[in-house]
Amino acid sequence: MSNETKCPFSHAAGGGTTNRDWWPNQLRLDLLSQHSSKSNPLGGDFNYAKAFKSLDFAAVKKDLAALMTDSQDWWPADFGHYGPLFIRMAWHSAGTYRIGDGRGGAGRGQQRFAPLNSWPDNASLDKARRLLWPIKQKYGQKISWADLMILAGNVALETMGFKTFGFGGGREDTWEPDADVSWGKEKTWLGGDLRYGKGAAGKDEGVVVADEALHGTETSRTDSGRNLENPLAAVQMGLIYVNPEGPDGNPDPLAAAHDIRESFGRMAMDDEETVALIAGGHAFGKTHGAGPADNIGPEPEGADLERQGLGWASTFGTGKGADTITSGLEVTWSNTPTKWGNSYLENLFGHEWELTKSPAGANQWVAKDAAETIPHAYDPAKKLRPTMLTTDLSLRFDPAYEKISRRFLEHPDQLADAFARAWFKLIHRDMGPRARYLGPEVPAEELLWQDPIPAVDHPLVNEQDVAALKQKILASGLPVSQLVQTAWASASTFRGSDKRGGANGARIRLAPQKDWAANEPEQLAKVLKVLEGIQAEFNGAQSGGKKISLADLIVLAGGAGIEQAAQKAGHRVTVPFTPGRMDASQEQTDVQSVGALEPIADGFRNFLKGKYNIRAEDLLIDKAQLLTLTAPEMTVLIGGLRVLNVHTGQDAHGVFTDRPETLSNDFFRNLLDMRTEWKPLSEARDVFEGRDAKTGAKKWTGTRVDLVFGSNSQLRALCEVYASEDGQEKFVRDFVAAWAKVMNLDRFDVA
């Protein structure tokens, strides 16, 4: 009997019930292996920075400028100019950034992939990217999609008469969706029921139209009772920022202002930057709501195969041009929608406004008794009355926003400068330091939000200096644990998401880092005082201007401690050290912005700032992912830091060794010892006690972070490698390599 003819075949690779179906709370170790070389078609040897430097930048800009007015029949340009569409594409690419965890943003070209390519707020941007394809095809790998989408937005502004602040390339494409970014827990588009205590239940249509049956007729919420879950910055699932109709579709400008301030603030924008972005962005283009939402087909990820990745097919009229349905709103703000000017603010303050409905049924506003002065996007003989969104009226009726908006109305030059700077910040916020910027249009001005660090202006230490400094450090009386902990505290602020933080700059000695609970301020101050003394003595004895920065000395001290600990375990190692870090000043440090880097948890130091509804082991994965660590690197660092007695606070949880400050594999050997029985010390199950299975004698205490390395099957398999009889040497070698990686994560100057 043929199995092929008699037995149904319904299980392709990856099909069937998965481990996460059985165990939904399984540890997300997969987050530590995303964006690997196996998903990258360019290979490990491809150097994007080198490729970008060979790009004919002027030619790309010329081609982009020509595209702006080259309207295509398959997707015509509003007002004969694609500029507003490309501004929206660039804005929505960058606008997913949130300062809380640094995730989102334009830096990886993620708008090409799910879920972003199918968010309701990104409707029709699939067409924008297809319009760009001939240019991307022409220049190939010399410019990434991530850079091209942002550059297209810049060129769009320039072709409509606006002078931009500059452009820095260097955004390297990824080839699969980011799995580490939480966009919220809602299961329906436009839902907000889980990110707020009370919010919209959501819906599935790909347009932002209020649905009274779902949203209700909720009254205004203008106080702080509307609390958005951290680190989210968008108010509803599938939106970039806020609902343009108002909170959950409620057309209340003051309630909307609360959402705007919260959302833009979480994207690192203050009130002036927020007003500038809205007023500047809405100087151009229009929204699209020509007909009811039920004319719209599935988003790109849900569309049929023959649609070839395009979504939101419309059966309304021609489905394009004047018949386009995108947001469900039908608003044109400016009298000159393809030319920079102040018409947006002039209209906003020059008319009184009454609530109306778009053809799609969305709440919007129309100027009372106003003349028809707004051009039609496709009929030059037709004029329209000025229209606004609820969120536009927020700029007039919120007292703080109104003050700024009126100043911009009276001083258009101030708006132009503020918008140029805010736009530049928006599209570069996740790129990290200026050292990463590429191309001929990088502005010379240094901006505070870029976390500036002085350029090296003196000769650096050589090998002999390094050896002498190590001796001084080890003779200072500072214990190995404190040397290592201080270096870790300095370097582990790095976030691979937005490339911020790290040891360079030595901001650990400045506010706010010097006062963070994770850094044990009293102990930190003592360590820094000793290291500053060594630094001053060394620098004072040099001729020719040679110096060592405190940033370098902190890292060197950690390495010296590790070398001594390895020697105690019988291994001679040299921890790699590359000088060249510099010390930032307090004036170069935005305290509020840097405050976003403060760890609420650092499993590598067994630190939890408070009690959270997220498991400590999940917070460890989050931290490891931000540090760009693999699962083996995370594992070996935990084992090494524990035996080096690195921990925050007095409780030596996880120090599974009777010879602390010796770089041994004791953590792994003792964790996997079957002669130890573990029991939780409280109902919270956050701290555990390990006792001898025979005698009952207390041996160790450990946290959830410690015990997960023996509990989780994958982590236990990694621990077994290092706990084996032949694992000690590999452990030391791998620990030193992982340590050096963390110490150098922010060294873009030597990468």
From Swiss-Prot:
Crosslinked positions (Tryptophyl-tyrosyl-methioninium (Trp-Tyr) (with M-267)): W91-Y241
Residue positions of the active site: H92
CC cofactor: heme b
Any one GO molecular function term: metal ion binding
InterPro entries (UniProt xref): Catalase_peroxidase (IPR000763), Haem_peroxidase (IPR002016), Haem_peroxidase_sf (IPR010255), Peroxidases_AS (IPR019794), Peroxidases_heam-ligand_BS (IPR019793)
Cross-link named Tryptophyl-tyrosyl-methioninium (Tyr-Met) (with W-91), sites: Y241-M267
Protein name: Catalase-peroxidase
Species for this entry: Cupriavidus necator (strain ATCC 17699 / DSM 428 / KCTC 22496 / NCIMB 10442 / H16 / Stanier 337)
